[in-house]
Regions:
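Short, contiguous alpha-helical
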Residues: 1-13, 47-106, 139-197
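Terminal targeting/low-complexity segments that flank the catalytic cores of oxidoreductases
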Residues: 1-35
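Acidic/His metal-coordination segments adjacent to aromatic residues that form catalytic metal sites
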Residues: 14-22, 108-124, 163-175
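Domain-scale detector for complete catalytic domains at protein termini or as standalone homologs
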Residues: 26, 30-34, 124-127, 131, ...
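Acidic/histidine-rich alpha-helical segments that form the ligand environment
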Residues: 28, 32, 97-151
Length: 197
């Protein structure tokens, strides 16, 4: 999806009443995740080894998206249990599969950590993680009893600065959902071949 179209959709969705906003995001999530997953499934190990526009391999870029989605799954668990400011908002509470809890000083520190980790992974491992996390996150957000609009609304307010001096003020639960979609639809779309240059 072209960035301009995506951000205009986000601004329009953010202005909707919460119940309608939730339905719109479920639809946008489906619209965004399908081409992302198609690109991930079609990527070969050779493709994954190519260098992206930010000097990571495409495999590391996909791994990076998957790890942010994994972190978001942890955050959604917190939101479901009533946490108003999930740890992801402070870059803390990231739990490795072995139980190690990590905190990061910056987004770049998180990204560098994941790039180093995925440099040692096979493409098959990264691909499986990406497919699983994208599917799980979509299922969680789409489930109205688990991630209801009321639960998203109860989280603390957050102003998301968008390109071209646009911004939206939503609760951080909504923001986490929207930024997940931005990651799949816009941020790495050119590298993954999801949109034409």
């Amino acid at each position: 999806m072209k960035a301009e179209i995506f951000y205009h959709k986000i601004v329009a969705i953010a202005a909707q009443p919460p119940a309608e906003r939730r339905n719109s995001l479920v639809g946008l999530h489906t619209e965004v995740v399908t081409p992302y997953l198609n690109a991930v499934r079609a990527m070969t190990a050779q493709d994954a080894g190519r260098v992206s526009s930010d000097n990571r391999t495409l495999g590391q870029v996909v791994g990076h998206i998957a790890e942010w989605e994994r972190f978001s799954i942890l955050a959604v668990g917190e939101i479901i249990t009533g946490v108003r400011w999930p740890q992801i908002m402070n870059l803390s509470g990231y739990v490795e599969p072995d139980g190690q809890v990590c905190e990061f000083s910056s987004i770049d520190a998180f990204n560098d950590y994941q790039a180093s980790k995925h440099a040692a992974w096979s493409w098959e491992q990264i691909q499986n993680l990406a497919i699983q996390t994208a599917a799980i996150l979509q299922i969680l957000f789409a489930h109205p009893s688990l991630v209801s609009w009321e639960r998203l609304e109860q989280t603390k307010a957050y102003r998301w600065q968008l390109p071209n001096e646009m911004s939206v003020m939503v609760s951080c639960g909504w923001y986490l959902w929207m930024v997940t979609l931005e990651h799949e639809a816009v941020e790495h779309a050119l590298d993954l071949g999801i949109v034409e240059p």
